Amino acid sequence: TQYSAEYLENLGLIKMDFLGLRNLGIIAEIMDDINPKFDINKIPLNDKKTFELISNVNLLGVFQLESNGMQNLARRMRPNSFEELSMMIALFRPGPMENIPSFLENRAHREKIKYLTKELEPILKETYGIIVYQEQIMSIARKLANFSYGKADVLRRAMSKKKAKELEKLKPEFIDGCLKNGYDIALANELYELILRFANYGFNKSHSIAYGLVAYRMAYLKANYPLYFYKALLNGTIGASEKTYAYIKEIRSRNIGLLGLSINKSTNEYQIVDDKILLPLSICRDVGSANVSKIMEAKPFSSYVDAICKLTEKGVDIKALTSLIAGGAFDEFGLSRYSMALNLSRVIQYANSTNGLN
């Protein structure tokens, strides 16, 4: 029998979300290409080239940072530390997002930052007077309204689950706590309204740091190992033609070499050959993974006719062979694509008669 998450949570059971992240696979592939002993945990978190890449908005393919909105924020903010990168990721959410102009203004003119009360300064100083993290809400509730750690966490969970009724229920207790601490009711109400607006979609700090770390690592690898970065990125998007086109367009703009299809060298994945990226057979329309496996089994090929004979014997159909010719997979044999396509049926007939004799 299965129960939905909220009932299990009410019973006191621990609920964990395990989410797959293909970017971790991309990072692992890049590390292995650089050096099997390369340790991503030892890269510096203050790499100049990485922050230049982020500030210059060269963010295509970088986790959490490649959307138009995030690129616009990166252009305006130009983060210069890992902590600021994590803040940027936390800010770009429906709750904190409305405070982005104030955040940028305060960051540029820190001497002008004003706090509703001096007790907020140690809580909000790191984020330039703006509420960015759920933990800051908890600290405000504890410091100003005398909430216990447990009660502050109830408030945090109500925010993260967007439970409007529960948030409204906690309001009198928050106001009362503020009044008992000597704050006036206007300030207490203003603080709680801030909390409610933030509740739209606030991140906890650990979440932002974790996302920031993956984003930073991908930006670091793109800045310092672009060839390996693009190769792994393309392998992660095989079958997604729109993304593949965008990545290849950027690769060409950066003067990174691309090698066309080779029936002998290409496989089912992008590879690095002579400091260039070799295209895979799998990008050819109508070829498919099953045919790629057959091609891999039939290699090597000494000529166009030899290739067609072996592939016909393996069961690669004429549609796939036509696509491979059009894609340039047989160009290495020195024949024109036109002549190869024109004579394909005859070569297949020859292959069938030869294979029958064998």
Q: What do the PLM-derived regions correspond to, one by one?
A:
Residues T1-N358:
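Noncatalytic, beta-rich nucleic-acid-contacting surfaces in large DNA/RNA-processing enzymes
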